Amino acid sequence: MKAGIIGLGLMGGSLGLALKESGLFESILGDDINEMHRRQAIYLGLVDECVRENEIFNCDVVFISTPIGGIIKIIRNIKKLSKNQLIIDFGSSKKQILESIPNHLRANFVSLHPMCGTENFGPKAALKDLYKNQIVIFIDIEKSGEKQIELAKKIFIKLGMNIIKMDSNAHDAHAALISHMPHIISYALANSVLKEERAQDIVAIAGGGFKSMSRLSKSSGNMWVEIIKHNKYEILSSITSFKKELENAITLIENNDFMNLEKWMDNANKLREIL
């Protein structure tokens, strides 16, 4: 079998390394709209060869790991697929992606979301073990072909991932809360510090707490604007919920109600029981 990867950044590049190690494919082809990324992917050994998008779709399995707008555009440009071909997208919100797939090609698609990543981006950020022991969510697979589902499962089990099934509505709501909103909070924290006159001095004394919470603010703005744009309403709902919790904390502090502030914090501690 041949595999093709469109988008050779952190996710696509790491996938290339993992697929090479898996031994499932005789060759792995890649494509990226950024010419430098194409050259870096070859130099770093992420893929065997870089070709153009139309050649990628001659592969048995095609992985699309571009920003969401790019995924939708690529899907709309597909004219035809062979009966057994498998197309996998890595989009981090799903409803708009799934709605863009033509009915006559739907069986070829398995839409999934690997729940892993780092704040780094581009081919140089690729990690061979990025996917190992992580969760991958298979979304709305009841409309995918049986052969496509089985092959997708085989691939990601081989990569050491744990498979969870979910519908697109639940996925997009959950992803907004545990993935998308934390990035926005991290950007907000970073901007709060950067607007101070002596931001560099403040950061110089930062401990683990600040570094942990601000880490996500190093993520690609271009990629995250795409994610937010395509999951806007779920993210706004999550931010509204978070805002209410902040307002609650502000009220407790303003009123010197430290007993209930501690109870508020103790309630948050319960998260440890399910993590």
Q: Where are the regions a protein language model picked out?
A:
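Short beta->alpha hinge that forms the Motif I/post-I loop of the SAM-binding pocket
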Residues: 33-34, 66, 90-92
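NAD(P)+-binding Rossmann beta1-loop-alpha1 motif at the extreme N-terminus of oxidoreductases
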Residues: 1-53, 61
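Rossmann-like NAD(P)(H) cofactor-binding subdomain of soluble oxidoreductases
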Residues: 74-124
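Short, structured coil segments at secondary-structure junctions
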Residues: 24, 44-46, 83, 104-105, ...
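Internal alpha-helical scaffold of NAD(P)-dependent oxidoreductase catalytic cores
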Residues: 128-215
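Interdomain hinge/lid region at the active-site interface
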Residues: 199-268
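Residues at the starts of beta-strands that form the adenosine-phosphate
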Residues: 2, 27, 108, 135, ...
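Rossmann-like NAD(P)-binding element
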Residues: 54-88
